[in-house]
């Protein structure tokens, strides 16, 4: 195993293939999208475990370590090839991440699978954060709602970014990943193959022209869409914008993905301790289908 600050194109390709193999075997992606985006950059550390099979080296394990950022601790995500498991590779990589990032480092277990729970217990790690994946069919949606003195539009280009950033960073000031965005965060996502301005909805105050909230949708496949981000300016809370924007995006995804008798679902992620949001999404017909858990050697109250 070795730490690397940047990856060659070939190494990044091998890691993507590793992630695909693990996803197929486990039924859940072992790392988040932000890790895949980070493969082309040097903003995180890359721990790579390779095996020489005589025909060349193959990546058998990979860990991404994102450094601490303001109040957010270091974040680690790890994946081991299905054919290379039960050899201690994952445990060794996690130990290396804890040594590199410190005891407050969070190690994500996507899906919190049995093997991940056993590894966490063996390493003496404690669950410190839970992220719920909720899902519902894109059928029989609740009717769309409106909000008074609000104009809805779709994203029209980078000149909208300043207002999107203002609302996003106000709405998610508490969030370790979603808060503190810059122009680069939007530009990077705008360059992703899935980006579609027609699925990026904005709500403006009719009187002042200020952005009040937004709903960014994402299409993963012909059968799965996502409520990617819903953000409402805290100063505009209480006007029904969250529900109106969410339903606007859901109906857009239904129209895009369920034509010609096709069947599709929509999913989202929400913090488990955000009970108000969880209740809201349950009222909209979402159910919990998966849980991602962050483990750490030190509980938050001890940091």
Curated annotation (Swiss-Prot):
Residues 150-303 form the N-acetyltransferase domain. This is Mycothiol acetyltransferase. 1D-myo-inositol 2-(L-cysteinylamino)-2-deoxy-alpha-D-glucopyranoside binds at residues 33, 177, 218, 226, 269. Acetyl-CoA 1 binds at residues 78-80, 86-91. SUPFAM superfamilies: Acyl-CoA N-acyltransferases (Nat). One of its GO terms (molecular function) is mycothiol synthase activity. GO terms for biological process: mycothiol biosynthetic process. PANTHER family: L-AMINO ACID N-ACETYLTRANSFERASE, MYCOTHIOL ACETYLTRANSFERASE. Acetyl-CoA 2 binds at residues 230-232, 274-279. Keywords: Acyltransferase, Repeat, Transferase. It comes from Mycolicibacterium gilvum (strain PYR-GCK). Its EC number is 2.3.1.189. The keyword ATP-binding does not apply. The lineage of its organism: Bacteria, Bacillati, Actinomycetota, Actinomycetes, Mycobacteriales. Belongs to the acetyltransferase family. MshD subfamily. It is an enzyme of class 2 (transferase). Transmembrane segments: none annotated. Catalyzes the transfer of acetyl from acetyl-CoA to desacetylmycothiol (Cys-GlcN-Ins) to form mycothiol. Monomer. The keyword Repeat applies. It catalyses: 1D-myo-inositol 2-(L-cysteinylamino)-2-deoxy-alpha-D-glucopyranoside + acetyl-CoA = mycothiol + CoA + H(+).
């Amino acid at each position: 195993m070795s730490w690397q600050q940047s990856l060659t194109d070939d190494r990044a390709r091998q890691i993507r293939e590793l992630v695909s193999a693990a996803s197929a075997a486990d039924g859940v992606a072992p790392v988040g999208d932000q890790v895949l985006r980070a493969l082309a950059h040097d903003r995180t550390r890359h721990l790579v475990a390779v095996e020489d099979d005589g025909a060349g080296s193959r990546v058998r394990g990979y860990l991404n370590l994102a450094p601490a950022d303001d109040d957010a601790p270091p974040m680690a995500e790890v994946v081991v090839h299905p054919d290379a498991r039960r050899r201690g590779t994952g445990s060794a990589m996690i130990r290396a991440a804890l040594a590199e990032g410190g005891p407050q480092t969070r190690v994500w277990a996507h899906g919190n699978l049995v093997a991940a729970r056993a590894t966490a217990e063996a390493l003496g790690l404690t669950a410190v954060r839970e992220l719920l994946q909720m899902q519902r069919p894109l059928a029989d949606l609740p009717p769309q709602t409106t909000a008074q003195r609000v104009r809805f539009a779709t994203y029209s280009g980078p000149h909208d970014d300043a207002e999107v950033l203002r609302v996003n960073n106000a709405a998610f000031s508490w969030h370790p990943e979603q808060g503190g965005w810059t122009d680069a965060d939007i530009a990077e996502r705008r360059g992703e193959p899935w980006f579609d301005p027609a699925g990026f909805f904005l709500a403006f105050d009719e009187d002042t022209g200020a952005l009040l909230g937004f709903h960014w949708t994402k299409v993963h496949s012909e059968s799965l869409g996502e409520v990617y981000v819903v953000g409402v300016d805290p100063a505009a809370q209480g006007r029904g914008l969250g529900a109106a924007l969410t339903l606007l995006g859901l109906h857009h995804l239904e129209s895009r993905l369920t034509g010609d008798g096709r069947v599709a679902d929509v999913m989202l992620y929400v913090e488990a301790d955000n009970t108000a949001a969880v209740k809201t999404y349950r009222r909209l017909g979402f159910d919990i289908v998966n849980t991602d858990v962050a483990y750490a050697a030190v509980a938050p109250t001890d940091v």
